[in-house]
């Protein structure tokens, strides 16, 4: 087990420091999960995972319950997940994951952000091949026998396991699987009584690119602008 290399997060995860935006994103995730599998987390593994992320973000229980109730109602908003691809300045590839109830509005806004920050919104498939979609779990390492855990999870889809750092600088164990094995690995982790700090699918850059600080800052300004958009859930890039 080694240290997992992760692309720069200085602003990639900036929204997690803006609580209202965090809760909006999670509320949409709840709505999508409930729509797909119902409001009971015991029988809906996707919802169960989203609720774990809500707890990790310190989302108040009343807000979580309200989001589930709204998503269960007949007038619930029907969100569509749309992935946009493009380039930031200096050839850095971006994947922009959105959850929208108005695709026309969303694509116009995403294009505006790219244009304003010297980027280029591309077509489907233009940069997706530079990433691998994976299931990513982050665990608190306290009390874990990491060698034993790694051996046990290999049979359930584990591909990579290594050390990482959380948003507040805390140590974490990062576990990755192929996206197709996400559910299987989630079940194996839960069967061991472990509660992940977070669990989600992510687009992991295959070949991260290093840039000088001044050029990297230009890229991250576009990433930050996209992340502030109401329809954008997450932004992935291959900036090292």
From Swiss-Prot:
Q: Which domain of life is it from?
A: Bacteria
Q: Which GO terms describe its molecular function?
A: DNA binding
- Main location (coarse class): cytoplasm
- Cellular component GO terms, alphabetically? cytosol
Q: What InterPro entries has UniProt attached to this entry?
A: Integrase-like_N, TACO1_YebC-like_2nd/3rd_dom, TACO1_YebC_N, Transcrip_reg_TACO1-like, Transcrip_reg_TACO1-like_dom3, YebC-like
Keywords assigned: Cytoplasm, DNA-binding, Transcription, Transcription regulation
Example of a GO biological process term: regulation of DNA-templated transcription
| Localisation | Cytoplasm
Where are the annotated coiled coils located? none
Q: Which family does it belong to?
A: Belongs to the TACO1 family.
What is the protein name given in its UniProt record?
Probable transcriptional regulatory protein MXAN_7062
Question: Could you read off the lineage of the organism from its UniProt record?
Answer: Bacteria, Pseudomonadati, Myxococcota, Myxococcia, Myxococcales
